[in-house]
């Protein structure tokens, strides 16, 4: 098939509403370590700085800024502690377990697109895929379980450097288009 175009989607905030999952897990994670629960505006303001795409790092940064702003002597938690707390809130258990065992905030997510969108794109010779900072189990859950997509083209956490680095987008575009992008060597 000769493609007429290519669309690479983010997942969070584009394919699924994560305000009652990732964002809620961020709020509750921060609260569990410093007793302060940031607002959605606090979270958005930090995300808008452009470097806090990873919610674990975002949570840690919110804790650090709060404790500094309030002159607290609280020692920030280790990143591993943030990951463990966040994961328990978000998944409700281990993310590698079967989806049916998940009981966390991930169950609150609503789909923002019509399930037929991707077949419509394919029918119109438009290639598509996903580039997300989400963990692989979370990304696959929404794409395969909620949207019923079979092996969707996906670059997720750990597959490429974190956004805003464009490497994940470039790699997936090259794979889908089957040619190298960029300037000639």
Regions found by a protein language model. Give the residues of each.
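Non-catalytic pre-domain segments flanking phosphatase-related domains
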Residues: 1-9, 68-80
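Active-site neighborhood of HAD-like aspartate-dependent phosphohydrolases
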Residues: 1-45, 51, 57
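Short, acidic loop-to-helix structural element flanking the phosphoryl-transfer center
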Residues: 3, 8, 88-130, 134-144, ...
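Hydrophobic alpha-helical core bundles mediating ligand binding, dimerization, or RNAP-core interactions
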Residues: 22-26, 30, 63, 138-143
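Generic non-transmembrane alpha-helical segments
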Residues: 25-33, 85, 89, 101
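Helix-loop "lid/cap" segments that line or gate small-molecule binding pockets
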Residues: 27-33, 56-72, 172
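Alpha-helix termini
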Residues: 67-73, 118-119, 174-184
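Substrate-recognition "cap/lid" segment bordering the active-site pocket of phosphatases
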Residues: 129, 134-185
């Amino acid at each position: 098939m000769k493609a007429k175009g290519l669309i690479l989607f983010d997942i969070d905030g584009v394919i699924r509403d994560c305000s009652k999952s990732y964002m809620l897990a961020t709020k509750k994670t921060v609260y569990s370590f410093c007793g302060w629960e940031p607002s959605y505006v606090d979270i958005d303001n930090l995300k808008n700085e452009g470097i806090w795409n990873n919610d674990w790092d975002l949570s840690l940064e919110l804790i650090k800024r709060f404790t500094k702003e309030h002159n607290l002597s609280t020692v920030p938690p280790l990143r591993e502690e943030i990951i463990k707390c966040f994961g328990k809130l978000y998944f409700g258990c281990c993310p590698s377990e079967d989806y049916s065992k998940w009981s966390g905030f991930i169950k609150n997510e609503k789909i923002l697109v019509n399930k037929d969108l991707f077949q419509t794109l394919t029918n119109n010779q438009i290639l598509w895929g996903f580039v997300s900072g989400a963990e692989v189990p979370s990304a696959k859950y929404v794409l395969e379980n909620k949207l019923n997509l079979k092996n969707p083209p996906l670059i997720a956490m750990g597959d490429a450097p974190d956004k805003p680095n464009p490497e994940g987008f470039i790699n997936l575009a090259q794979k889908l288009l089957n040619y190298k992008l960029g300037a000639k060597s």
